[in-house]
């Protein structure tokens, strides 16, 4: 669309960056302490668990990008992939902080749920950052949309840095405190990610004529 993007549409889109900022911040801030202090996981093992999704992202994100372009070419929208991520991420995030196990079993639980959360995050984030180019064909308007996204991302990071530790403390620390925090953050993720995912139904996609296949995507 070439018309200027309205304030309501800008806010609806940028709201997703509060969710992405929160998810990008909280695991790095609290997950290591949750595993070592509340679950009894050795620090070295906990460090490996926290690092694991970064390696997975390098393989999975290009796959999501290729799938998003194929979806856009087939349906004219990226909505289904965005919705999949918006719905799956809150569930996986809450599950990270609900381990029924301790020690090595807890490390495995957190590793699996963290990878699932990272995968769900990619399902939302990869098509989400492609939307500004499809919301307007004017470079200055795309820049404006991106600026809004960055501002809301900053808000999300700041909110996460203050809210998550405060909720853990108010809920009594320990496993219960982290479980309550996970549920609160999951609710925040659900709201902030669903709004732009549903709003993307009104944004016609503009994928390339020939989206990359899986092998080509992994080479990029």
Residue ranges of model-derived segments:
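Membrane-embedded alpha-helical bundles of multi-pass transporters/translocases
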Residues: 1-220
């Amino acid at each position: 669309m070439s018309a200027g993007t309205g304030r309501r549409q800008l806010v609806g889109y940028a709201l997703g960056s509060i969710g992405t900022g929160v998810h990008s911040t909280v695991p790095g801030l609290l997950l290591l302490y949750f595993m070592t202090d509340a679950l009894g996981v050795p620090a070295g093992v906990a460090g490996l668990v926290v690092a694991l999704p970064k390696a997975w992202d390098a393989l999975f994100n290009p796959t999501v990008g290729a799938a998003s372009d194929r979806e856009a070419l087939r349906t004219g929208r990226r909505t289904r992939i965005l919705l999949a991520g918006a719905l799956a991420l809150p569930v996986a995030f809450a599950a990270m902080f609900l381990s029924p196990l301790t020690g090595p079993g807890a490390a495995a639980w957190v590793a699996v749920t963290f990878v699932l959360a990272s995968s769900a995050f990619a399902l939302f984030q990869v098509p989400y950052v492609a939307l500004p180019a499809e919301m307007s064909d004017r470079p200055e308007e795309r820049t404006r949309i991106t600026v809004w996204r960055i501002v809301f991302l900053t808000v999300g990071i700041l909110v996460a840095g203050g809210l998550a530790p405060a909720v853990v403390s108010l809920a009594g620390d320990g496993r219960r405190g982290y479980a309550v925090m996970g549920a609160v953050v999951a609710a925040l993720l659900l709201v902030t990610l669903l709004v732009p995912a549903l709003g993307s139904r009104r944004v016609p996609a503009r994928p390339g004529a020939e989206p990359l296949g899986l092998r080509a995507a992994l080479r990029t």
